[in-house]
Amino acid sequence: MKTYVFPGQGSQRKGMGENLFDEFPDQTKIADRILGYSVKELCLRDPDHKLNQTQYTQPALYVVNALSYQKKMKDDGIQPDFLAGHSLGEYNALQAAGVIGFEDGLKLVKRRGELMSHARNGGMAAILNCSEKLTRQLLKEANLTTIDIANLNSPSQIVISGLTEDVNRAQPYFEKANAMFIPLNTSGAFHSRYMKETEKEFEKIVTETNFSKPHVEVIANVTGRPYKSGEVSQNLINQLSSCVRWTDTIMYLLAQGEMEFEELGVGDVLTKLIVWIKKGYDPEMNPSSDQVEPKPGPGKEQSTVATLGNSKVVSDVKSNNSSPETRRVGQKIEELDSMKLVEQWNKVYPIGTKVTSDFYDTELETRTEAMLLFGHRAAVYMKNYNGYFDLREVRPAV
């Protein structure tokens, strides 16, 4: 069996959709008319630096994802058995399943992005090396039950959402529990109770939209199960304030039998998440049943680095950065893809390596080994900065 999955916000990058806009000019013109600007110009050149703004990001990703699916059908015509998308990507899954047309889907996404961009006073953070159960426990112990779980991305990658001051207060509690806390650059508390007012506004356009029956089963974010008859409108409304149950989604699909996943659209974030979820999959849990709550397999809460970076601490590397091998690694860094970059860095540079960056004035020291954040970003945590740097932005101090 085959499942096509579509990524959501965070996967965007300048240059996405190259060749697709010219290959599908009719859809591109429709998108330009609905949006009021050139989606091709936004995606390929982004002259006004708007691509990372929510109201522009979401329509751009929707269009590129949709054109990617159309190209897939044009090239080989292989129909999937299931469809799923992460947050925004769910709109592409519904469009691919025939539930909604390209135009109506884009109109919904355009309005969704506009409304979400207006959200204020909210914050989000990714929690690594922490299970859902432990996350809820820590929030309760810290008297921070005002914070919601926004994304269950993998058994040990959770995203929390709430008022900015509450999210900031949560950081020391997670770090004390040896979890990694990564504040996210968002203006709103997406996928939390604080989006309820936004839901009311979004409901106006959703209820005016006609939805058809899917010709392929689509897995809903809010349940991690296939859509039932008549659920589309309410699920899309509720999605704004509900948790994205991505782990449950993949667990359910794995329980259907031998499953092949293919990510369509921008990047491979979901592909990497699926690899990690598979490692925690236990067929005996039978997540195909609505009564069963999937849970991580043995050892999946033990090491964020092992889970995210597919690497290990090299404890016998004593030299800091003076060897010829180290210098050669530095010279080759930009030639490696993110996974290889992480693996090579960890072979040569131990925790505590002194580094410099063009984006920071003083010398920094690594606090962790390198790892993949969100499946695509090679990064390392800095001790005296209390944040992450992309590995391509740092170099060993001389």
Predicted regions mapped to residue ranges:
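FabD-like malonyl-/acyl-CoA
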Residues: 1-137, 260-282
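Alpha/beta catalytic cores of group-transfer enzymes, especially the acyltransferase/condensing modules
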Residues: 9-11, 35-37, 74, 97-241
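Short, flexible loop segments at the rims of nucleotide/cofactor-binding pockets, characterized by
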Residues: 61, 236-242, 334
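Flexible, low-complexity segments
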Residues: 64-69, 73-83, 240-314
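Mixed-charge, Lys/Arg-rich low-complexity intrinsically disordered regions
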Residues: 320-354
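Basic/aromatic-rich interaction segments and small domains that mediate binding to polyanionic partners
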Residues: 356-395
